[in-house]
Curated annotation (Swiss-Prot):
It comes from Mus musculus (Mouse). A motif (WSXWS motif) lies at residues 218-222. CDD domains: FN3 (cd00063). It holds the Pfam family FN3_7. This is Interleukin-7 receptor subunit alpha. It is found in: Membrane. Residues 21-239 are extracellular. Residues 347-357 have a biased composition (Polar residues). N-glycosylated IL-7Ralpha binds IL7 300-fold more tightly than the unglycosylated form. The lineage of its organism: Eukaryota, Metazoa, Chordata, Craniata, Vertebrata. Residues 1-20 form the signal peptide.
Length: 459
């Protein structure tokens, strides 16, 4: 009986000891929980399952005992005040459509009814993009590059559509540095010249929100994909491109040398090296030389090449044509009377006016045409007298106008004389050929000349 009592006493003591140890353990857990660092992080993913959003939280220290800890979010919710996150190992999450996506929420770590730590976060600023998928790399032989394509889940989303992608690739062996390419589309190209020939490469891609309202973090890397670069072309062989370029270059240089040699004097040299003009020749071209042989004579023969229009002669001709009934030549008796009057008029003039200038003859000719007939207008001008210095010794000299006199033996034969300048329409036009004049005109000229000679002899 004593043995049975001892046994009950031992069992009771053991029960008390076990119960005391268990109570002390719970109190110790509370003390340890208060002393640990409960810092955490959270991120959201929008429209992961239709209109439902996902919120995920976890502690920064993975060694924390999370047996009695829980996460709770309050504020910026649609129909509820607070929501408690579900636990999956060391991760806390909740999938719901109650997020307002406007304003900030209060996320707290709780142990029982006690809040250990809290953070104020906005769901739209902690968005984590979804990882791209279906990454493919295709080699294009014609373009000599690699085409990289992948799928981004955000293209079909309602809220988050604009994201930035980061494509990273590196050789699969022997190198740890990644080459990054940033883009906003789901396809890109990698030129073959940037890759090593006949090498295996690893490539992967990730995304991050790129929006003014929705901001957040990089997504997880997509599953890696590998591709191999081809061998270099014509390795160890003959490249026909370089010789072709060399031959074309030499031929072009040879052609340029020939053209330069042919066109040097006519085209190239005047442009590259212009010649200076001679100043003497330039001055000769600019300055006109004065004429040395100026014709200042009043001789009618000097104006044979010129057409002289006399206004008075034209007026006199018009008056003659209006007064004369016909253009019949004058009778011989009238011609003799005219010659006699001309001789008497010449004898009565003073010796000082020895020669009748052409202007006097031209001025008197229209008057004679008016007084008598047009035939008298064609008579050549004669010397009215000789020079005042005329001497007796000069009498034996032949007269100046000897050609005007007929031969002494035959006075009735026409004598060729220089054709005078006929008066026609006020223009002096020379007659190139000598024509025989009428006998009456020759007699008048001879009579006038003999009369003047007798006048000088008497004087």
């Amino acid at each position: 009986m004593m043995a049975l009592g001892r046994a009950f006493a031992i069992v009771f003591c053991l029960i008390q000891a076990v119960s005391g140890e268990s109570g002390n353990a719970q109190d110790g857990d509370l003390e340890d929980a208060d002393a640990d660092d409960h810092s955490f992080w959270c991120h959201s993913q929008l429209e992961v399952d239709g209109s439902q959003h996902l919120l995920t939280c976890a502690f920064n220290d993975s060694d924390i005992n999370t047996a009695n800890l829980e996460f709770q979010i309050c504020g910026a919710l649609l129909r509820v005040k607070c929501l408690t996150l579900n636990k999956l190992q060391d991760i806390y999450f909740i999938k719901t459509s109650e997020f307002l996506l406007i304003g900030s929420s209060n996320i707290c770590v709780k142990l029982g009814q006690k809040n250990l730590t809290c953070k104020n976060m906005a769901i739209n600023t902690i968005v984590k993009a979804e990882a791209p998928s279906d990454l493919k790399v295709v080699y294009r032989k014609e373009a000599n590059d690699f085409l990289v394509t992948f799928n981004a889940p955000h293209l079909k989303k309602k809220y988050l559509k604009k994201v930035k992608h980061d494509v990273a690739y590196r050789p699969a062996r022997g190198e740890s540095n990644w080459t990054h390419v940033s883009l906003f589309h789901t396809r890109t190209t990698i030129p073959q010249r940037k890759l090593r020939p006949k090498a295996m490469y690893e490539i992967k891609v990730r995304s991050i929100p790129h929006n003014d309202y929705f901001k957040g973090f990089w997504s997880e890397w997509s599953p890696s994909s590998t591709f191999e670069t081809p061998e270099p072309k014509n390795q160890g062989g003959w490249d026909p491109v370089l010789p072709s370029v060399t031959i074309l270059s030499l031929f072009s240089v040879f052609l340029l040398v020939i053209l330069a040699h042919v066109l040097w004097k006519k085209r190239i040299k005047p442009v590259v090296w212009p010649s200076l003009p001679d100043h003497k020749k330039t001055l000769e071209q600019l300055c006109k030389k004065p004429k040395t042989s100026l014709n200042v004579s009043f001789n009618p023969e000097s104006f044979l090449d010129c057409q002289i229009h006399e206004v008075k002669g034209v007026e006199a001709r018009d008056e003659v044509e209006s007064f004369l009934p016909n253009d019949l030549p004058a009778q011989p008796e009238e011609l003799e009377t005219q010659g006699h009057r001309a001789a008497v008029h010449s004898a009565n003039r003073s010796p000082e006016t020895s020669v009748s200038p052409p202007e006097t003859v031209r001025r008197e000719s229209p008057l004679r045409c008016l007084a008598r007939n047009l035939s008298t207008c064609n008579a050549p001008p004669l010397l009215s007298s000789r020079s005042p210095d005329y001497r007796d010794g000069d009498r034996n000299r032949p007269p100046v106008y000897q050609d005007l006199l007929p031969n002494s033996g035959n006075t009735n034969v026409p004598v060729p004389v220089p054709q005078p300048l006929p008066f026609q329409s006020g223009i002096l036009i020379p007659v190139s050929q000598r024509q025989p004049i009428s006998t009456s005109s020759v007699l008048n000229q001879e009579e006038a000349y003999v009369t003047m000679s007798s006048f000088y002899q008497n004087k």
